[in-house]
């Protein structure tokens, strides 16, 4: 009896093949979000300080924080940044838009170092490497550690 039920619920072979192909096509997109090793395996490249200045500065970027709140930032060539987030003072996702102000620079290792103020909370400098995969940017605390978490930054149209 259970075999009869399984036969009625079975997915046709062509549907399975199409589903498998779809998963393979979207695998690099999904992989690029997990960690630095998978991002580099998918073909991402570390961007240089000059590439950061040319391709990122004066463009609005959006992406998640470590806590999952959405962040929108614009780096100015003067070394300041401005934006907004939907996070509370503790960095947790919230419903209220909070202004973000800060400063940025590039250290001797080519990392982009950022200090931000969320409302009245100051976040100390954090230096990260920036990578590019297709049209998106990713930030990571490490340059080569394959297990390092990456956060996506998408250029806002």
Regions found by a protein language model. Give the residues of each.
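Lipid interaction determinants
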Residues: 2-10, 30-103, 109-157
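Segments that shape or occlude catalytic/ligand-binding pockets
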Residues: 13
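Bacterial N-terminal signal peptides
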Residues: 16-28
């Amino acid at each position: 009896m259970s075999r009869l039920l399984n036969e009625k619920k079975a997915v046709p072979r062509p549907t399975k093949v199409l589903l498998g192909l779809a998963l393979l096509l979207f695998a690099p997109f999904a992989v690029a979000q997990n960690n630095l090793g998978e991002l580099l395996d998918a073909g991402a490249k570390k961007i240089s300080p000059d590439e950061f200045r040319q391709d990122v500065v004066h463009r609005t970027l959006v992406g998640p924080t470590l806590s999952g709140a959405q962040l929108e930032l614009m780096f100015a060539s003067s070394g300041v940044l401005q934006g907004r987030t939907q996070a509370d003072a503790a960095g947790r996702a919230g419903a209220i838009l909070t202004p973000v102000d800060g400063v940025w620079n590039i250290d001797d290792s080519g990392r982009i170092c950022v200090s931000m103020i969320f409302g009245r909370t100051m976040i100390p400098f954090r230096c990260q490497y920036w990578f590019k995969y297709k049209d998106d940017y990713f930030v990571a605390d490490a340059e080569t550690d394959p297990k390092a978490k990456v956060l996506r930054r998408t250029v806002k149209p």
